[in-house]
Amino acid sequence: MSNDSSGSEWELYRYTPSKGAAIALTVLFIVTTLIYSLQVVWDARKASKPEVDNPFDTPVDKCESITAISLGENYKKLTVRSTFSAFIPLFFGCIMEIVGYIARAVSSSNTKEIAPYVIQAVLLLIAPALYAATIYMLFGRLLHVMRCESLMIVSSRFGTSFFVFGDVVSFCLQAAGGGLMATVNGRTTGSNLITAGLVIQIVFFGVFIINEFRFSYSVARVCPFYRHISKKWWFLNLTLMLSSILIMVRSIVRLVEFVEGYDGFIISHEYFIYVFDAVPMLLAAIVFIVGSFFGNIFTTITECQSLKP
């Protein structure tokens, strides 16, 4: 962290925080989270309904021959339950955004109170890591069901785990750093931890986005049944790519903020937290909601696993 001010001059905020903006974001995230949750539950319930020749939710012994011939003998069938669990991190990420902006609204009324400041600072920092976890897991399932695991930049056996591991490390570093930032003696260490966490997040996300483009470019060559399925997978991948780019932009701006330090331009202007943090994270959740109407992981898995030889 560069050019820290002396402890006597240090304040929690370098500006007067807007209570109205924090309340507005709280409401927007509540509405978005409710719609997102209902949408995921609805999609999962639709996929759970028994359908003719749909092995996505039928016993293995009834669909084994179809799956083996269409998807390969070593294919591990995906279930609605295991797929549904991939959405849980993003849900809690949205909850963190809600609680974070509630705490920010409270903090705006008392800018000397440390507790609400720490809550909003930490939760708004680490929430994107939970978004990323959902994106990583959904992408891994998409590659699996389309038999494109060979397109993973890292070993297909550890592909999803590799990205999630980086996400967890980033999450822990930012959480620890966010707590230390609230103290005069710990703010330099806290800033360094957050910077390290953001760098890790950006590096892993960068590799992941490259992997998404690689998949988009090579899927027609690798997927054995590419010409026999609709474009629902394409809309799902587009959803993941757009969300990833939004989070990447947000993380880059936050990284610059902490590299600049306490006396930097970004940290002293509140609109950055809304334009380059709140808006991208809100849009990322909205992209999931809108994208599900055109193609979601449940419809993609159902379609791929329903193929007949």
From Swiss-Prot:
Confers resistance to molasses (to a particular toxic element present in some molasses). Belongs to the lipid-translocating exporter (LTE) (TC 9.A.26.1) family. This is Protein RTM1. The gene is RTM1. It is a multi-pass membrane protein. The chain crosses the membrane at residues 22-42, 83-103, 119-139, 162-182, 193-213, 233-253, 278-298. Keywords: Membrane, Transmembrane, Transmembrane helix. GO terms for cellular component: membrane. It is found in: Membrane. InterPro entries: RTA1.
